């Protein structure tokens, strides 16, 4: 046995080295992982993807071991609203299943598709067996789960003063079982460890290095006789990146469905209404009573959006735990903002004398809520269409645009009575409508054609392109024309403004649903260099010669 403490640094930095040229794609590591961790059908903590490209005889094939990368800068940790996803001092990113609520914030933040949420237990043969029942982990159902580098083995190694990179009985299951010695585990902080020696002597690559996550699985891709190569135009062309059969191309996320989307549709609309009403009140365009009426309606919509999110949670009765991490999680901050807003509105309802400060507090809280929604989506580092710089601006401006649209709809249809203090004249409302429509159009066109386009995968760009014309015509141009018609129309403009408001809301709902449900392709796997394991022009230079 090896004394780990005598050789490694303190604290260690555990990681893996995978030799792509050694991996034969036998899947022994995936089976060993499933056996040791007792994962149910459909749950893969460790996977081996088969990458085959080209056309005969110029073909190339290699195998890539993937899973949680235990990043030094893990994007999954700060987004977790409960603190269930944690990073230890030794670098391991672990899960506390008892704290997780199954919100999937970590899953969409992970750019390596490493997390799974199994809402119901599945059996390998369709019915329960004694062995599966004895190995069942009910604490993992409805919550996020992923590779832990067999943390139980690592901790056992520490307690027994062994080296999990050398001693097989405490080595992670995938590394211990690899038949070709392609997977090595060890301490990157120890310069004499097996993994440090491997990466010191040979060139390595890491998955999705451009994202700045500093993943701790490093891949050897080159040997003296079979040198690696740079990714070429064929690897990066749009056709290759749009091929759904390409295992390196990200699949559409299924963690956040229509229920989660309703939070952005209803919550964004409600908070936009509250912020718009607050601004109008501050500049003297609507009365205190009218402001309160609109805030009540906004509160109902925000609550409805949060209710749909609650329905999406894997562990709904733990939802209160989402208040635990306001220091890092925008989801936690969103709940606090909603709480402040709702309490302010309810207190205003109960007191006999209006308190101006409560109206301002509610308006400020609604603004924070809208900003939190923008940042929640932007923090999803695993979804390129969400993490681009214009997305937060789109969420905020669209929320205000929809809020003005809803105000027009409510007033024009007499849902909220117009006592003459809602606005000075129709021309001002039309001006606000046109201004926000133009600003939103500029942001959307920038999102579609600007630098954001290059940051999105081609499959997501197709969705964005298909959404653009309906969105611009129905959600922007038509409301602008109706608002301008109301501007110049001397007679009753209620029908024009109500229709314009409805179209604005419809447009906002359309693009949010499209962005969250349709354009939400995961990042996939990006390799800056690749091994040359092929034939014809794809063969290594030394073999061609």
Predicted regions: what they are:
Residues 1-257, 265, 276-282, 300:
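Non-ligating segments of multi-cofactor redox enzymes
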Residues 284, 313-316, 513-525:
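Juxtamembrane/interface segments at transmembrane-helix termini
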């Amino acid at each position: 046995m090896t004394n780990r403490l005598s050789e490694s640094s303190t604290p260690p930095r555990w990681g893996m080295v995978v030799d792509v040229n050694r991996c034969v794609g036998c899947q022994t590591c995936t089976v060993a992982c499933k056996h040791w961790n007792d994962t149910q059908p459909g749950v893969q903590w460790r996977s081996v993807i088969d990458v085959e490209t080209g056309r005969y005889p110029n073909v190339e094939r290699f195998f890539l071991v993937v899973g949680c990368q235990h990043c030094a800068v893990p994007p999954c940790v700060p987004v977790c609203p409960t603190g269930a996803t944690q990073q230890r001092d030794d670098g391991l990113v672990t899960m506390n299943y008892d704290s997780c609520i199954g919100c999937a914030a970590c899953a969409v933040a992970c750019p390596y598709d490493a997390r799974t949420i199994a809402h119901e237990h599945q059996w390998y043969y369709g019915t329960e067996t004694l062995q599966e029942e004895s190995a069942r982990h009910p604490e993992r159902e409805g919550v996020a789960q992923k590779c832990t580098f067999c943390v139980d083995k690592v901790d056992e190694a520490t307690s027994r003063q062994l080296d999990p990179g050398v001693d097989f009985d405490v080595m992670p299951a995938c590394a211990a079982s690899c038949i070709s010695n392609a997977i090595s585990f060890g301490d990157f902080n120890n310069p004499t460890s097996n993994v440090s020696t491997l990466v010191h002597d040979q060139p390595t690559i890491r998955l999705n290095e451009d994202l700045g996550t500093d993943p701790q699985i490093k891949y050897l891709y080159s040997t003296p006789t079979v040198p690696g190569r740079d990714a070429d135009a064929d690897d990066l062309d749009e056709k290759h990146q749009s091929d759904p059969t390409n295992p390196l191309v990200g699949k559409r996320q299924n963690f956040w469905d229509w229920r989660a989307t309703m939070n952005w549709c209803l919550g964004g609309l409600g908070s936009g209404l509250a912020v718009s009403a607050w601004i109008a009140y501050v500049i003297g365009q609507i009365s205190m009573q009218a402001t309160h009426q609109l805030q009540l309606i906004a509160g109902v919509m925000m609550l409805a959006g949060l209710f749909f999110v609650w329905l999406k949670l894997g562990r709904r009765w733990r939802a209160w735990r989402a208040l635990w991490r306001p220091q890092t999680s925008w989801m936690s901050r969103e709940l606090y903002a909603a709480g402040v807003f709702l309490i302010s509105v309810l207190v205003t309802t109960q007191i006999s004398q209006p308190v101006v400060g409560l109206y301002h507090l509610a308006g400020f809280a609604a603004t924070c809520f809208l900003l939190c929604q923008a940042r929640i989506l932007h923090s999803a580092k695993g979804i390129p269409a969400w993490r681009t710089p214009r997305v937060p601006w789109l969420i905020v401006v669209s929320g205000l645009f929809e809020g003005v649209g809803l105000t027009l709809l409510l007033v024009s249809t007499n849902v909220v009575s117009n006592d003459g203090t809602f606005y000075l004249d129709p021309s001002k409302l039309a001006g606000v409508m046109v201004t926000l429509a133009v600003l939103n159009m500029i942001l959307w066109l920038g999102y579609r054609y600007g630098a954001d386009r290059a940051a999105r995968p081609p499959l997501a760009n197709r969705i964005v392109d298909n959404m653009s014309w309906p969105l611009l015509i129905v959600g922007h141009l038509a409301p602008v024309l109706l608002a301008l018609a109301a501007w110049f129309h001397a007679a009753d403009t209620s029908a024009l403004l109500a229709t314009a408001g409805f179209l604005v809301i419809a447009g906002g709902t359309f693009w949010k649903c499209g962005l969250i449900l349709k354009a939400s392709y995961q990042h996939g796997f990006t390799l800056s260099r690749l091994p040359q394991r092929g034939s014809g022009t794809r063969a290594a230079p030394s073999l061609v010669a």
